[in-house]
A protein has these predicted regions:
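N-terminal regions immediately upstream of nucleotidyltransferase
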Residues: 1-77, 95, 199
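Conserved nucleotidyltransferase catalytic core and NTase-mimicking acidic/glycine-rich helix/loop elements
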Residues: 2-3, 178-325
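Active-site nucleotide-donor binding segment shared across nucleotidyl transfer reactions
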Residues: 56, 65-112
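Conserved catalytic core of two-metal-ion nucleotidyltransferases
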Residues: 63-66, 70, 112-167, 188, ...
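Helix-loop-helix transmembrane hairpins and adjacent membrane-interface loops
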Residues: 74, 106-108, 116, 170-173, ...
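Glycine-rich, histidine-containing beta strand-loop boundary motifs that form or position
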Residues: 83-85, 96, 102-105, 126, ...
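A glycine-rich phosphate-binding loop feature that marks nucleotide/adenosyl-phosphate handling sites
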Residues: 133-142, 278-283, 327-330
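Extended catalytic-interface subdomain
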Residues: 163-180
Length: 330
């Protein structure tokens, strides 16, 4: 992969840059914004070259965003900075939100001027910074009442600061103590999927993230399996026959296709845009069809067939899971 930018983004170099500018918040904002834009430019060029898989593109992109957050972060002895959501999964695309959890043992530790300044610096990035702050007790309380927060925690990944919060979070996710049981989590995620289907129906302008049979259908299965088996997820679900190897392979291929389309849309619009708008459809078709040498109709047929396959497999797996917890088929 082209590395002219990435070589300049090693953590050691960034640490030196930010430590010298630390007292000047304005300079720090300028530096982190420029570094971010450099990385976006370079990873976009790498994607457009069609030399690398989308998995490698996403992993590399997130790999080089992490040091920006670490090196612009002051030393926190008692606050954990944790990536959640798509950023936690290392699937964050170009202009997607950067979602963070700031976790400490109590609220007094979170009432920290350096934390406020750090958040202010991050908000200078040309993407939305979604964040929440919690102490250990409030995290459990909110996770029990908010399925969106609970789901985001499944994707949690340590970035910097104190590791105590991450150790605590891993422990509660593993033993499920004081968290909803799988039965309740399963019902909530099925209800969430139905509500999303109603909000984003099939249309001539599909949403790559939310429309029926697209990325969220894949994410829902991932979250259900990850909640059930925090460790060795894929091996366990294959062994338990919740999913077959051919089904898994189809879902993996679908994830690659949807992620590629989504990544290209973000480049094309230079913003967060998950909808296949009419002008975007033509651009996507031209880009992917030119590479494959296939006619335009072939690409769209592949896309729609893939959404149908994902829907079918999603429904089949949810039915199997429902049976395992003695629930009627949703």
């Amino acid at each position: 992969m082209p590395n002219s930018i990435f070589q300049s983004c090693h953590q050691k170099d960034l640490k030196s840059l930010f430590s010298s500018a630390y007292k000047d918040i304005g300079a720090q904002k300028k530096q982190i914004k420029q570094r971010f834009q450099d990385i976006v430019h370079e990873i976009s060029a790498a994607f457009l070259s069609r030399k690398y898989s989308i998995d490698k593109i996403l992993l590399t992109y997130n790999k080089y965003i992490d040091p920006l957050l670490r090196c612009s972060c002051p030393t926190f002895d008692s606050i954990s900075v944790i990536a959640v959501g798509g950023y936690g999964r290392k699937e964050r695309t170009l202009y997607s939100d950067i979602d963070l959890l700031f976790l400490a043992q109590n609220d007094q530790l979170l009432n920290n001027q350096r934390l406020f300044e750090y958040i202010d610096v991050l908000q200078s990035l040309p993407v939305r910074i979604g964040y929440c702050t919690h102490n250990f007790d409030s995290l459990i309380t909110y996770a029990n009442n908010d399925v969106h927060l609970l789901t985001a925690l499944i994707d949690a990944r340590f970035i910097c600061g104190s590791d105590a919060g991450m150790v605590y979070l891993k422990k509660i996710l593993h033993n499920k103590k004081n968290l909803p049981c799988f039965h309740d989590f399963f019902i909530r995620k099925c209800q969430e999927q139905k509500a999303r289907d109603y909000k984003y129906p099939m249309s001539g302008v599909p949403d790559i993230k939310n429309t029926v049979g697209n990325l969220r259908y894949l994410h829902t299965l991932y979250w259900l399996f990850k909640f059930m088996f925090p460790k060795n997820t894929i091996n366990r679900v294959l062994q338990q026959k919740y999913i077959s190897q051919p089904e898994f392979n189809r879902l993996k291929n679908a994830h690659c296709l949807f992620s590629e389309i989504r990544f290209y849309l973000y480049i094309y619009y230079q913003r967060q845009e998950n909808r296949l708008l009419l002008d975007g459809q033509q651009a996507v078709i031209n880009f992917f069809s030119a590479d494959s040498g296939r006619p335009i109709e072939s690409f769209m047929y592949r896309y729609h067939k893939t959404t149908q396959e994902v829907s079918r497999i999603n429904y089949a797996i949810i039915a199997r899971l429902a049976n395992s917890v003695n629930l009627p088929k949703p």
